[in-house]
Amino acid sequence: MMQDLRLILIIVGAIAIIALLVHGFWTSRKERSSMFRDRPLKRMKSRDDESENEDFDDNVEGVGEVRVHPVTHAPHGAHGEHEAPRQAPQHQYQPPYERQMQQPVRPDEPVRQPQQSPRQAPVQPQGQQPVPHAAPQPGWQQPQPAQPPVQPQHQPQPVVQQPVAPQPVTPTVAQPQPAAPQQPVPQPVAAPQPAVAEPQPVEPQQPAAPQPKERKETVIVMNVAAHHGAQLNGEVLINSIQQAGFKFGEMNIFHRHLSPDGSGPVLFSLANMVKPGTFNPDSMADMMTPGVTIFMQVPSYGDELQNFKLMLQSAQYIADEVGGVVLDDQRRMMTPQKLREYQDRIREVKDANA
C-alpha cells in the first residue's frame, strides 16, 4: 500500500509540474504575440507621422510661389480660375515676413506694383542665378528675389574672412619659443641629488645579527630563597648543601665537582645571597640568610646541558630541605619557559664555540 501511495503521489506531482510548465510557456507566447501585434501599429503610426511631416515641409517650401500668383491675379478674373486652389495654403503657411510683403500689394493696383519692382533690380545682380529664371516668367515672381539676395549677402562675407586668417604668419614666432624651454633645462641643477638621502638608512645598525656569535660564554643563575618574610636556617642549609654534593672551597663558597667526593673540574657553584656572598662553615649553624645563589659558567667541562640538569636537581633538593622555593636569575618563580630559555642560551654558546 505504501508503495502504491508513493507512486500515486509521484505521478500527481509530475503531472502538476508539467501543467505549470505548459501554462508558463503558453502565457509567455501569448504575451510575445500581443507585443508583436502592437509593433506594426506603432510602425504605421510613425510612418503616417513622417509622411505628414514631409507633406507639411513640401507645402511650406511651395508657399512662396503660391503666395505670389494669387496676389497678382486677384483683380483679373481670367487667371483666378487656374490659381484658385493654391490660395488655401497661402493663408495657412504664410510666414510673418511674407504677409508684410503681401499687405502693400492688396490696396494698390497689381499692374503698377510689378513696374515698381525693377527698383530692386540692382539687388538681383548679386545673386546672378535667380535672374535667368525670372526672365521667362511675367512680373508676378519679382518679389521672390527678396529671399535670394539675403543668402548671397552672407556667402561672400565668409569668403572674405578666409583669406584674412592665413595672412598672419605664425611660423615666424615658433623660432623664439625653443629658446625659452632651453633656459629651464639648467635649472634642475642636481641640487636635490646631493641630499644623499639614500645612504641615510644606517645599515651598520644591522650588526645585531652577529651578536649570537659574540656570545661565546654565559652564566646560568638560579636562586633558592625562603618564602616572603622568612629566612633560611643556617644549620639545615649547610646539611642540605653537603648532601647535594657541594664542597667548600675557593673564594669561601661551595662548589659542585665532577665527582661527589670533591675531585675533578668544577661544574657549578653556590654562594650566599647576602653580600659579600661568602660562607663561614664554623659559624653557619648560627647563621640566618634569605637564600643562596647557584650559578654555572658556560662553557664548562663535559656536556653543559647535562650539567644544567644536575644544577636544577640540586636547587630543587635544597629548596625542599630548607622549605624554600627555586627562583630564576630575576628572582621570580621558575617557569618552564624560563628553563627553555636557559637551554637555548646554552645551545647558542655551544654552537658559537663549535
Swiss-Prot record:
Keywords: Cell cycle, Cell division, Cell inner membrane, Cell membrane, Membrane, Transmembrane, Transmembrane helix. Residues 49-60 have a biased composition (Acidic residues). Essential cell division protein that stabilizes the FtsZ protofilaments by cross-linking them and that serves as a cytoplasmic membrane anchor for the Z ring. Also required for the recruitment to the septal ring of downstream cell division proteins. Residues 1-6 are periplasmic. The keyword Methyltransferase does not apply. The lineage of its organism: Bacteria, Pseudomonadati, Pseudomonadota, Gammaproteobacteria, Enterobacterales. Its main location: membrane. Residues 120-144, 152-164 have a biased composition (Low complexity). Residues 28-354 are cytoplasmic. The chain crosses the membrane at residues 7-27. Interacts with FtsZ via their C-terminal domains. Pfam families: ZipA_C. Belongs to the ZipA family. It is a single-pass type I membrane protein. Residues 41-215 are annotated as: Disordered. It is found in: Cell inner membrane. NCBIfam families: septum_zipA. SUPFAM superfamilies: Cell-division protein ZipA, C-terminal domain (SSF64383). Residues 178-191, 201-210 have a biased composition (Pro residues). InterPro entries: Cell_div_ZipA, ZipA_FtsZ-bd_C, ZipA_FtsZ-bd_C_sf. This is Cell division protein ZipA. GO terms for cellular component: cell division site; plasma membrane. The keyword Transmembrane applies. One of its GO terms (biological process) is FtsZ-dependent cytokinesis.
